């Protein structure tokens, strides 16, 4: 026994080796909650418009396909969980270059960055439109005869939002993700209120709860067939109609690609926390986006619903049980949250684009200027 203790003693008292990492920039790591909030900043915003857009093309069956897309998102997340931990210098550029060649690598990276560049400004302008509409409606309610130009005001708001999140990301992802987490919390509260309040409203109606569910009938519009619109044979094949309907609902996945970009910033234990990040994103998206789409179809009358195509949650707020003034207050709250989450989509696009450009710069594709750290913040 003494001999065994003597043998084990050196290994038990061995000192941990200290490692010093030399780097040109400051490392910053964030929690899985913050990482999830960054991705949801873009992914969650689709709840405002996805149901209305999909219904225009596929009819009232849209909520079922949106639910299917969000379940499919779990499979996409599984791919990210498997591929993101595999360190590949240069990221998507290096992977595509080694498999398809340099030209395809440049096209793929350019397309990805272009997607992020479009996402930010479009989301911020949309948020500006929501805010401008709310401001003009509020002034009208209080009898103030002043109406702001929605286009100019939305542009001004968009510029402020983009500059704000750009500066937050200059200070580091810890700063920008903190703002994203606050937006995520407010959005989660709003989503819970909408879904619970909506279910209660349906339960208190005379008809049975399940009688309100939309019928499982695909009614594709002429435009939804695209280049197959004149092919009558295609309209007779059910599988083609299902695939087209599914395709028109894929927009609900917008922003999910940022999940692969935030992996490097997730704190230790990295893979375990990354799995938690994916789980939070899945539970949030599979609840809010399809839930809003179903409630929009079940609560808002068919002849009124087209008015709320771009803001389905705002329409739901007006048909919830309760006094009219409470509906108006809740609708204003929904619009404000919409402005916030659309602003969060700007942060998501900046984080994603920054990560892609960093990977490409590390592979010496871009000049050294892109890798130059900030003098004050080291980012």
Tell what function each PLM region has.
Residues 81, 198-212, 276-319:
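Extracellular/periplasmic helix-exit of transmembrane alpha-helices
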Residues 11-18, 78-104, 125-144, 171, ...:
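Flexible loop linkers connecting adjacent transmembrane helices
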Residues 185-254, 283, 299-303:
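Helix-loop-helix junctions that connect adjacent transmembrane segments
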Residues 1-50, 85, 94, 102, ...:
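Membrane-interface "cap" regions at the ends of multi-pass membrane proteins
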Residues 51-111, 121-161, 282-286, 290:
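Extracellular loop-to-transmembrane helix junctions
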Residues 81-86, 107, 161-186, 261-267:
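Membrane-water interface regions at transmembrane-helix termini and the short interhelical loops
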Residues 27-47, 161-164, 220-279, 330, ...:
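Hydrophobic, membrane-embedded alpha-helices of multi-pass small-molecule transporters
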Residues 102-105, 147-159, 265-289, 358-379:
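Loop-to-transmembrane helix boundary motifs in multi-pass membrane proteins
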